[in-house]
């Protein structure tokens, strides 16, 4: 119903009731009806204005494509997933036959070297310029806690082709022991994993290494617990 129709109906009702009303009681009834009619007309007019100017009502529909995402990382990952599968990639694992040191190996079942990445001098050599995801995980294991503080470090370093200086790009340190195990107490085993990862702009010829400070604590019990890799984006 439009606002004009509502006003017309109210006026007709006022005329009918005015004819039937008489005396003081009728005057009071007419006054109440007039006040009610005024409020009704004012409310209807306000509602019409709000609807007309779009203050209330259905919201504007979003564009068919949804909100635009302009994050550089999102765009990079999206374009990378749509590209061909000739991107450089490497995933090397720890050599379980080299106790006392962390040696990377690319010949195990779950290792991967593709599209130009090389493993030289225990370092991954980048074959092309671009953005790369660099990641690594190590797992430490021990029995009891010594009297001296025990700190475990895991560091990923880069030697850029443009400046032959070793620079740490990812680093973490953990301490599995908060106090010494008493001589009379049972030495309980502990485990301490460290995972690191990040996206970096690399150049062709850059060398990447993943190292730890205490290789004697490395846990080789399960395959795939200690690894290092890069993925071109």
Curated annotation (Swiss-Prot):
Membrane topology: Single-pass type II membrane protein
Disulfide bridge map: 145-177
Modified residues (Phosphoserine): 2
Residues bearing carbohydrate: 80
GO molecular function: cytokine activity; tumor necrosis factor receptor binding
Principal localisation: membrane
Keyword entries, A-Z: Cell membrane, Cytokine, Disulfide bond, Glycoprotein, Lipoprotein, Membrane, Myristate, Phosphoprotein, Secreted, Signal-anchor, Transmembrane, Transmembrane helix
Cytoplasmic side: 1-33
GO biological process: extrinsic apoptotic signaling pathway via death domain receptors; immune response; necroptotic signaling pathway; negative regulation of protein-containing complex disassembly; positive regulation of apoptotic process; positive regulation of canonical NF-kappaB signal transduction; positive regulation of extrinsic apoptotic signaling pathway; positive regulation of JUN kinase activity
Superkingdom of origin: Eukaryota
THD domain: residues covered: 88-233
TM regions (residue ranges): 34-56
SUPFAM superfamilies the record matches: TNF-like
Localization: Cell membrane
Lipidation (N6-myristoyl lysine): 20
Similarity remark: Belongs to the tumor necrosis factor family.
Entry function: Cytokine that binds to TNFRSF1A/TNFR1 and TNFRSF1B/TNFBR. It is mainly secreted by macrophages and can induce cell death of certain tumor cell lines. It is potent pyrogen causing fever by direct action or by stimulation of interleukin-1 secretion and is implicated in the induction of cachexia, Under certain conditions it can stimulate cell proliferation and induce cell differentiation. Induces insulin resistance in adipocytes via inhibition of insulin-induced IRS1 tyrosine phosphorylation and insulin-induced glucose uptake. The TNF intracellular domain (ICD) form induces IL12 production in dendritic cells.
UniProt protein name: Tumor necrosis factor
Organism: Bubalus bubalis (Domestic water buffalo)
Lineage of origin: Eukaryota, Metazoa, Chordata, Craniata, Vertebrata
């Amino acid at each position: 119903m439009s606002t004009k129709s509502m006003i017309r109906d109210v006026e007709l009702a006022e005329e009918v009731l005015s004819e039937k009303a008489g005396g003081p009681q009728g005057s009071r009834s007419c006054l109440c009806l007039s006040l009610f009619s005024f409020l009704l007309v004012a409310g209807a007019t306000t509602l019409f204005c709000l609807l007309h100017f779009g203050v209330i009502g259905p919201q504007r529909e979003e564009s068919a494509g949804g909100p635009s995402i302009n994050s550089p990382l999102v765009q990079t990952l999206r374009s990378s997933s749509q590209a061909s599968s000739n991107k450089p990639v490497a995933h090397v694992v720890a050599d379980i036959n080299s106790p006392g040191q962390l040696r990377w190996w690319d010949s195990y079942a779950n290792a991967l070297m593709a599209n130009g990445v090389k493993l030289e001098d225990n370092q991954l050599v980048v074959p092309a310029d671009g953005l790369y995801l660099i990641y690594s995980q190590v797992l430490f294991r021990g029995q009891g806690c010594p009297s001296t503080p025990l700190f475990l470090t895991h560091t990923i370093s880069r030697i850029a082709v443009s400046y032959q200086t070793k620079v740490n790009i990812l680093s973490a340190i953990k301490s599995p022991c908060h106090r010494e195990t008493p001589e009379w107490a049972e030495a309980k085993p502990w485990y301490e994993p460290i995972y690191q990862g990040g996206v970096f702009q690399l150049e062709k010829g850059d060398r990447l290494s993943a190292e730890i400070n205490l290789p004697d604590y490395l846990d080789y019990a399960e395959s795939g617990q200690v690894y290092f890799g890069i993925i071109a984006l």
